[in-house]
């Protein structure tokens, strides 16, 4: 971003020590700006009273500025002490029109009218604002729009085509922020945010007011007892006050009903679902991107010699080891190679998965086929109760002994197995127990549930709605826990291995709650109890909850304290926020109550510790379900008709030339493998200098373009498979993000400019094919997500004016991966091809990791970057390449688990040796395995 004040101070050493004035301070880079902001904010906190303190912020380009004080939207609109501007009056007018609509609307039409109005504003909030924020998060779209439209530039420069709008926005913003703010000097990003905020204020206020008006429209007085009436109104008012608190404190919308009406309830559920989708699809990915970036690459010491003990541990390691490699420390977290949890990880080649599916099928048959008699109900109740006891007490006892004496691991080592085998067997046992615990409970619920004859009798419908909501809450909680902990934490891995880090990271749901499974983890159990409304099911739910609390208190909590000590967080994020909002007397009373409860718990712990030899007690662990995967949405360019502004443009003046990393010579040789007829076995004779272009898989490709001087600034170049387009004049398929603009600053997306190297360089053209004159040339680079990660024949297409009319085609080129031929490489000192596999694999892995120095290894023993574990696309690229090169298919988790090229090369050699007896080639092994 260009400097806002060109005459301002320059970023030298002295400037870093000076305090900036109200004008922004332009530093060289973001890191210098970050240090400067921390320094200035700390100085303000140390030397000034709270009312006189100023807050300093920074922009991505390194601009440091004073962040003016702003107020929440309710105070801005309704507080008489806050200055009002035209936008405030407009928002108040819209709110008044909503109230007036309720007044004049007929009673019979109020419900549908205000339901539609509320759903409109809710869609504007979750879909509209969500779309804007997603574009800003991924493509910086709002800031680019402001920059390209020049809407915030001073009209005196002659660049602003809308001086009236500029003056209006300037007056609005400076009226609203009278102190520490000047519109002309504020960074572009801050001014863009201020305008965006006014739009958000309008939508949020209309969303809230229209909801309240809809609730008023649905107001009624059902026939009920005064006790139920008072309880209902008290609960509703408390929830409403809490909603206002959350709205003012955190600017979020949490709405619940204060009147007994299913219309309000159902529309509240729709609103909550929309809000949840907004948080999941828009807010959470942005939070992870900004505040939880991948940690720096794990570095290891290089060594020249590698011991056999360092090889990756597998079930076949002792029998089939062929070479050496550096792997993980045996005392640390094991490599997660084949996950168990979730339907997407079900593998019927694994005995535990077959066992779980068969047992679940038996439970389904037991619940649906057997007669609904008292004896069958009693059997299913006892069956579910026994599984719950085993799941809580049995597994709890095993974990307690493992925590204190490592009994589980010692048992397997005693019989000649490894700690990795003990871990695998524990995961299978835990997974089976958890599944059967839930399946047996579900079977009991199915047998004891009776379909209501009248859904509107009493609380029947409400019970079913709340029960379904609690089920969804548990599913979401389990998914969030699994996303935060992974399978290592899901299966209590820190009971069996030292944790990867001595520091706890509170991410995902743990940012808000210390132990979400304490209450939310069993929400679905209570939901089913509400739906069935049966005493035995309530008894099972209460038993499950008590055992769960006991497990957390007496098994998990002591173990976590032994591992992390004082690093455990004493207060969750939600508790801290609510505590700060309470009055001082209430906070003091809560502290005293907490001390009393803690002392009581310690007394009970001591009592149980002395009685432990007599108690074989263990307790329940976390309840979770399948995990959900975030989807990314590639950019799309719509297919439109041929534009009308092509007159005067000659396609012959457009040209594309490509340059990439050529594939290995063996690729051309492997095309002719003796499979052809006799005449086709010799290389074809060429009558021209034309050569087939074959590039490496995943290597960046540069495209040099030429266009006339009057070419459209929104021209763009896309990458396509040759077979995907029938027409050579118009492209009729979307690029799916594989495109680069020819010029900067014409698209409201940073992704469009990613890859531009040179734009509109004026050159003279004098050749036999082109008439004399000038033209523009440029150069773009396709790499990473803008490439096709498969093999095939491709081409680049130059398109006109943001549309899909083709002006030029590049030469078609092929992406191929050379097969690794063991007969053409030299063996190492140990008589293996491990080193040759490493050398062949390393450049392929570097290409698969976008040649990014933060994640791509420079040597075979260097670890992959942390982003490889977070984003599965990198491992999938490597898996595809390995399959093409060596004919061996791995799961992506194997690449993530191995962690470097040397381990992966060892695994490839090991797999080839294991599979050699099954090869149909005589040179690779026997056709049928034989015993000696």
From Swiss-Prot:
Pathway: Phospholipid metabolism; phosphatidylcholine biosynthesis. The lineage of its organism: Eukaryota, Fungi, Dikarya, Ascomycota, Pezizomycotina. The chain crosses the membrane at residues 89-109, 113-133, 199-219, 226-246, 262-282, 356-376, 378-398, 429-449, 455-475, 519-539. PANTHER family: PHOSPHATIDYLETHANOLAMINE N-METHYLTRANSFERASE. It comes from the Eukaryota. Catalyzes the first step of the methylation pathway of phosphatidylcholine biosynthesis, the SAM-dependent methylation of phosphatidylethanolamine (PE) to phosphatidylmonomethylethanolamine (PMME). The keyword Transferase applies. The keyword Transferase applies. This is Phosphatidylethanolamine N-methyltransferase. Pfam families: PEMT. It catalyses: a 1,2-diacyl-sn-glycero-3-phosphoethanolamine + S-adenosyl-L-methionine = a 1,2-diacyl-sn-glycero-3-phospho-N-methylethanolamine + S-adenosyl-L-homocysteine + H(+). Residues 110-112, 220-225, 283-355, 399-428, 476-518 are cytoplasmic. GO terms for cellular component: cortical endoplasmic reticulum; endoplasmic reticulum membrane; perinuclear endoplasmic reticulum. GO terms for molecular function: phosphatidylethanolamine N-methyltransferase activity. Residues 1-61, 292-317 are annotated as: Disordered. Residues 1-21, 29-38, 301-313 have a biased composition (Basic and acidic residues). InterPro entries: Phopholipid_MeTrfase (IPR007318), Phosphatid-EA_MeTrfase_fun (IPR016219).
């Amino acid at each position: 971003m260009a400097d806002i004040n060109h005459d301002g101070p320059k970023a030298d050493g002295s400037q870093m020590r000076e305090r900036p004035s109200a004008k922004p301070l332009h530093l060289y880079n973001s890191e210098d700006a970050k240090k400067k902001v921390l320094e200035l904010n700390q100085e303000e906190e140390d030397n000034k009273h709270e009312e006189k303190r100023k807050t300093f912020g920074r922009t991505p380009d390194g601009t440091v500025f004073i962040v003016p004080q702003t107020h929440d939207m309710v105070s801005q609109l309704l507080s008489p002490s806050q200055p009002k501007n035209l936008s405030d009056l407009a928002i108040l007018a819209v709110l008044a029109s909503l109230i007036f609509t309720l007044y004049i609307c007929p009673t019979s039409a109020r419900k549908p009218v205000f339901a539609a109005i509320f759903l409109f504003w809710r869609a504007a909030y979750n879909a509209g604002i969500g779309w804007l924020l997603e574009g800003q998060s991924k493509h910086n779209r709002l800031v680019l729009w402001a920059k390209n439209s020049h809407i915030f530039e001073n009209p005196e420069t002659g660049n602003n085509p809308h001086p009236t709008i500029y003056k209006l926005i300037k007056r609005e913003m400076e009226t609203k922020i009278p102190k520490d703010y000047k519109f002309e000097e504020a960074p572009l990003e801050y001014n863009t945010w201020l305008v965006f905020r006014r739009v958000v204020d309008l939508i949020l206020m209309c969303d809230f007011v229209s909801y309240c008006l809809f609730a008023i429209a649905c107001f009624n007085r059902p026939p009920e007892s005064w006790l139920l009436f008072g309880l209902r109104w008290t609960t509703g008012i408390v929830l409403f006050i809490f909603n206002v608190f959350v709205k003012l404190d955190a600017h979020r919308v949490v709405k619940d009903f204060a009147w007994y009406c299913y219309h309000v309830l159902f529309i509240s559920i729709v609103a909550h679902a929309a809000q949840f989708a907004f948080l999941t699809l828009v807010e959470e990915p942005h939070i992870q991107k900004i505040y939880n970036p991948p940690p720096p690459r794990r570095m290891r010491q290089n060594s020249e010699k590698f011991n056999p003990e360092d090889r990756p541990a597998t079930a076949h390691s002792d029998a089939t080891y062929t070479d050496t490699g550096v792997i993980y420390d045996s005392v640390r977290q094991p490599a997660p190679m084949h996950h168990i949890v979730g339907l997407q990880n079900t593998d019927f080649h694994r005995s535990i998965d077959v066992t779980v599916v068969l047992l679940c099928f038996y439970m389904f048959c037991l619940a649906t086929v057997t007669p609904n008699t008292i004896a069958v109900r009693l059997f299913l109740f006892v069956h579910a109760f026994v599984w719950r006891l085993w799941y809580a007490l049995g597994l709890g006892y095993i974990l307690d002994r493992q925590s204190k004496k490592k009994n589980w691991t010692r048992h397997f080592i005693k019989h000649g197995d490894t700690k990795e085998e003990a871990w695998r067997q524990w995961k299978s046992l835990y997974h089976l127990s958890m599944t059967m615990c839930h399946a047996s409970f579900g079977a009991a619920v199915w047998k004891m549930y009776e379909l209501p004859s009248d859904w509107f009798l009493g609380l029947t419908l409400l019970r079913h709605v709340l029960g379904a909501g609690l089920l969804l809450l548990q599913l979401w909680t389990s998914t969030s826990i699994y996303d935060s902990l992974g399978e290592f934490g899901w299966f209590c891995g820190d009971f069996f291995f030292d944790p990867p880090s001595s520091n706890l990271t509170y991410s995902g749901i743990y940012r808000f709650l210390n132990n979400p499974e304490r209450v939310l983890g069993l929400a679905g159990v209570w939901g089913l109890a509400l739906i069935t409304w049966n005493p035995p099911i309530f008894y099972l739910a209460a038993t499950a909850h008590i055992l769960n609390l006991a497990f957390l208190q007496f098994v998990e909590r002591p173990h976590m304290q032994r591992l992390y000590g004082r690093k455990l967080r004493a207060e969750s994020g939600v508790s801290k926020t609510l505590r700060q909002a309470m009055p001082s007397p209430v906070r003091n009373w809560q502290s005293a109550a907490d001390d009393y409860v803690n002392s009581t718990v310690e007394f009970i712990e001591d009592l149980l510790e002395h009685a432990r030899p007599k108690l074989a007690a263990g307790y329940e662990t976390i309840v979770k379900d399948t995990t959900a995967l975030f989807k990314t949405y590639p950019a799309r360019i719509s297919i439109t008709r041929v534009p009308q502004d092509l007159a005067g443009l000659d396609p012959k003046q457009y040209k594309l030339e490509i340059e990439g990393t050529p594939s290995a010579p063996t690729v051309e040789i492997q095309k002719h493998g003796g499979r052809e007829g006799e005449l086709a076995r010799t290389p074809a004779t060429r009558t021209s200098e034309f050569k087939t272009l074959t590039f490496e898989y995943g290597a960046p490709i540069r495209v040099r373009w030429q266009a006339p001087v009057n070419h459209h600034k929104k021209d763009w170049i896309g990458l396509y498979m040759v077979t995907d387009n029938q027409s050579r004049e118009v492209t009729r398929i979307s690029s799916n993000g594989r495109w680069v603009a020819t010029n900067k600053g014409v698209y409201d997306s940073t992704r469009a400019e990613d890859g531009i190297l040179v734009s509109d360089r004026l050159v003279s053209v004098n050749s036999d094919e082109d008439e004399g004159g000038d033209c523009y040339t440029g150069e773009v680079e396709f790499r990473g997500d803008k490439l096709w990660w498969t093999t095939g024949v491709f081409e680049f297409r130059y398109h006109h004016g943001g549309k899909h009319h083709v002006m030029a085609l590049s030469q078609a080129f092929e992406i191929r991966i050379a097969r690794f031929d063991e007969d053409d490489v030299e063996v190492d000192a140990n008589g293996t091809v491990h080193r040759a596999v490493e050398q062949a694999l390393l450049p392929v892995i570097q290409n698969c990791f976008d040649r990014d120095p933060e994640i791509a290894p420079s040597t075979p023993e260097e670890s992959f970057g942390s982003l490889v574990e977070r984003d599965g696309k990198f491992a999938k690229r490597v898996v595809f390449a390995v399959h093409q090169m060596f004919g061996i298919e791995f799961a992506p988790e194997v690449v993530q688990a191995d962690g470097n090229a040397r381990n992966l090369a060892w695994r490839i050699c090991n797999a080839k040796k294991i599979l050699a007896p099954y090869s149909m080639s005589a040179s690779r092994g026997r056709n049928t395995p034989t015993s000696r």
